[in-house]
Design a protein with these regions (language model features):
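ATP-dependent carboxylate/acyl-activation modules
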Residues: 2, 260-293
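N-terminal glycine-/serine-/threonine-rich beta1-alpha1-beta2 phosphate-ribose binding loop
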Residues: 2-87
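Conserved active-site and cofactor/substrate-binding residues in soluble primary-metabolism enzymes
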Residues: 14, 18, 22, 60, ...
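General beta-strand structural signal in soluble alpha/beta enzymes
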Residues: 64-67, 90-92, 115-119, 142-145, ...
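Short glycine-rich anion-binding loops that position phosphate/pyrophosphate groups of nucleotides
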Residues: 70-72, 95, 120, 148, ...
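Rossmann-fold NAD(P)-binding glycine/threonine-rich loop
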Residues: 74-85, 94-132
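Rossmann-like NAD(P)H-binding beta-loop-alpha module
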Residues: 109-112, 116-185, 189-190, 197
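Substrate-binding/catalytic subdomain of NAD(P)-dependent oxidoreductase enzymes
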Residues: 167-265, 270-272
Length: 293
């Protein structure tokens, strides 16, 4: 029950796919803890899917909106409407932010409401808050890491078992680490969108997905992993954002890492992000990076 005299926080949920359903389950499971911490109990008062639900009714009956639809439309339209209606929005939609971040953040500022997006980058790793708060006045030179758990799982399994790409991808799908259509994960687009967001945060400059050079892991063969193993190297799909030649360079590419590199031991469906800043050297954070949440 909500604390006496308090009202529940009414949440309008946009999207009930893998992530949306996992969020709803986790919220129900931890409702008591949220209430104890905030004094208000979270309550999903309406949910919208691509085929069911009334967006206007959900918006009117909510205090905040959680967008987990994926894709750019109709997610963009709904998020803009929520912000203009004065409703704070939480989103995990990295494609939406990478392609339309300028517009969304501008509308949020004009409306005086928050647009939060921690879950859009590197899953459970609190890298967004770390960059915004811990590095608030510290100049960052470089942000790089493993930001896609699906591809890291595939490369790790190929290296450990000698199995081919298609076989390991099927295994990742069985385990829930890869979508039925894994294209954005394996071709590097998902990681590219996340790196565009991190670059914007780290360097305080707009970076769109079209400005990120990226390639994925579809062409990686078992022989590539065997060769790396012989040399004591690890093969990872890395995202890199750094200051270069007076501007910002952002790219995603498969890369061999030497033994002892902080990212070399990151295996399976895990993410890890490193931040380099002259004033503090470097910080590394890691955590689970694929699946429902």
């Amino acid at each position: 029950m909500a604390a006496e005299g308090s009202k529940p926080v009414r949440i309008g949920l946009l999207g009930r796919g893998t992530v949306g359903a996992a969020f709803a389950g986790l919220l129900a499971e931890r409702a008591d803890a949220v209430e104890a911490a905030t004094g208000r109990r979270p309550e999903i008062t309406g949910a919208l899917t691509r085929s069911e639900g009334d967006f206007e009714a959900i918006l009117a009956g909510s205090d905040l909106v959680v967008e987990l639809m994926g894709g750019t439309e109709p997610a963009r339209e709904h998020v803009l409407a929520a912000l203009r209606a004065g409703k704070p929005v939480v989103t995990a939609n990295k494609q939406l932010l990478a392609q339309h971040g300028d517009e969304l953040f501008a509308v949020a500022r004009e409306a005086g409401v928050q647009l939060r997006f921690e879950a859009a980058v590197a899953a459970v790793i609190p890298i967004v808050r770390t960059i915004q708060e811990s590095f608030g006045v510290t100049e960052i030179a470089k942000v790089f890491g493993i930001v896609n758990g699906t591809t890291n799982f595939i490369l790790s399994e190929m290296a450990a078992t000698g199995a081919g790409y298609d076989q390991v991808l099927a295994r990742a799908q069985e385990l829930g680490y890869a979508e039925a259509d894994p294209s954005d994960d394996v071709n590097g687009a998902d990681a590219a969108a996340k790196m565009a967001i991190l670059a914007r945060l780290a360097f305080h400059t707009p970076v769109t997905l079209s400005e990120v050079a990226y390639e994925g892991i579809e062409a990686i063969q078992p022989d590539d992993l065997a060769y790396a193993k012989e040399l004591g190297l690890s093969l990872k799909l890395l995202g890199v954002a750094e200051r270069r030649d007076g501007g910002v360079s952002v790219r995603v590419f498969p890369c061999f890492l030497y033994p002892g590199h902080p990212l070399a031991p990151i295996e399976g469906a895990f993410n890890a992000v490193m931040v380099e800043a002259p004033a503090i050297s470097e910080v590394t954070m890691s955590g689970p990076g694929a699946g429902g949440l």
